[in-house]
Amino acid sequence: MGLKVNVSAIFMAVLLTLQTPTGQIHWGNLSKIGVVGIGSASYKVMTRSSHQSLVIKLMPNITLLNNCTRVEIAEYRRLLRTVLEPIRDALNAMTQNIRPVQSVASSRRHKRFAGVVLAGAALGVATAAQITAGIALHQSMLNSQAIDNLRASLETTNQAIEAIRQAGQEMILAVQGVQDYINNELIPSMNQLSCDLIGQKLGLKLLRYYTEILSLFGPSLRDPISAEISIQALSYALGGDINKVLEKLGYSGGDLLGILESRGIKARITHVDTESYFIVLSIAYPTLSEIKGVIVHRLEGVSYNIGSQEWYTTVPKYVATQGYLISNFDESSCTFMPEGTVCSQNALYPMSPLLQECLRGSTKSCARTLVSGSFGNRFILSQGNLIANCASILCKCYTTGTIINQDPDKILTYIAADHCPVVEVNGVTIQVGSRRYPDAVYLHRIDLGPPISLERLDVGTNLGNAIAKLEDAKELLESSDQILRSMKGLSSTSIVYILIAVCLGGLIGIPALICCCRGRCNKKGEQVGMSRPGLKPDLTGTSKSYVRSL
């Protein structure tokens, strides 16, 4: 009974093993051809951004300092106009060519808002990015009544960060970089300092703030419509107090670092006021959505030797797995962190079936190419083991001082603590751990993939040869087509005449051939009869040598 139970248990274990999915990356087989994984992370995508307005007030409230700072304020206003007027003119030129599109309802005959349209004829030349930014600019613009209310509110406040709620609008933040200095230092010291000294201090502070604003909005002077401002540059102009601004915006969470590193928070200028000297920006701060089940893997390759030739396996730098599916991964729009991978857009795209077979462990499906020039990786540390191409670089056991040789029938050398605890490879000393990879991988036990060329000259040469062969094949096909067309051009009557002529020739030629054969046979019979003598000579008493000569 116990034997039956054990047999059943073994059978079930084998069955479960056979049903285990094999769609993930086969790191064991890939390591045999020098491909290892150096990290995996979750996959997060930025979703639709939330927009909120931010007002930067460039002119501080100096009601109590008017008598001492008139000259400095006049000079500061002149500098601000040189910065703000070009931006204002560009914004006006774009927004004047964008008007709302209104549709008329068929039932009630009244207009309703349908969207915006860009007057391209009046605008002239504009790039696609400028047109898209212009539409977004129109959609985020404040109306004239809101601008007037905002101007009145800013003229009465003297707080560095003031939250102002507009009717029908989102929360607006008014930020002024010099107001704290005026409130906390200049006004309390009015009785101790002279009027000239107060004016000089305020002038220096305003000049410094002007320099910061100029560095912040420098790209906007060249392209105020589509140039975007990162939150890092905005934090510099706000005195580095980015936490207070983000707190007022209502943004928090563990993904803040990922958004900042991926430059996900953007700000675009939507309004410039040259009367009260303030700028309105539309800030877009996205939220992150983690795609469940998707894991992003980073791959690295090590070159290996086959005889005197050095090869490496051609695999993508990043791939993604989701269940059985393996996909390519475009890392151009992504930021990689220990917490995960953050991308501004979807980075997954399909992978060829042959490359999927390669990553699943079929080494014969992995293409390889010759190493040209200096190749980056001839050794790599993975899971505490050193995978090195000791046929191309010097590998030395630092513990014993001996050279680690790589046999010609091995393509790579796997060094662990049981072989050498401390290894010196290419001048770098590395302490390795316990063995995680096999001691050696022999060439005759691996099915290598097809060799390919990635060099531009070689690819061009191969492509030229392929084109030449295609042209030759095309000429042969054209000649065969001509023969077929000539055969098709013959009429059925002509074909019948040709067959009749062939038959008549055969009827005449066959009897003549038979007669010729009979005549030759008769002549041969006559010649044989003439060559036979009637009497044989008497050879009695003749020597043997004479007989042999006969």
UniProtKB/Swiss-Prot annotation:
Write out the ranges of the annotated region (Interaction with hemagglutinin).
367-444
Compartment list: Virion membrane; Host cell membrane
Q: How does the protein associate with the membrane? A: Single-pass type I membrane protein; Single-pass membrane protein
Which chain positions carry the site (Cleavage)? 112-113
Keyword Ubl conjugation found: no
This protein's domain notes? Contains 3 heptad repreat regions, HRA, HRB and HRC.
- What function is annotated for this protein? Class I viral fusion protein. Under the current model, the protein has at least 3 conformational states: pre-fusion native state, pre-hairpin intermediate state, and post-fusion hairpin state. During viral and plasma cell membrane fusion, the heptad repeat (HR) regions assume a trimer-of-hairpins structure, positioning the fusion peptide in close proximity to the C-terminal region of the ectodomain. The formation of this structure appears to drive apposition and subsequent fusion of viral and plasma cell membranes. Some hyperfusogenic isolates can induce membrane fusion in SLAM- and nectin-4-negative cells and are linked to fatal subacute sclerosing panencephalitis (SSPE) or measles inclusion body encephalitis (MIBE). The neuropathogenicity is closely associated with enhanced propagation mediated by cell-to-cell fusion in the brain, which is principally regulated by hyperfusogenic mutations of the viral F protein. Cell-to-cell transmission of the virus also occurs with hyperfusogenic isolates.
Q: Tell me what this protein is called.
A: Fusion glycoprotein F0
Give the species: Measles virus (strain Ichinose-B95a)
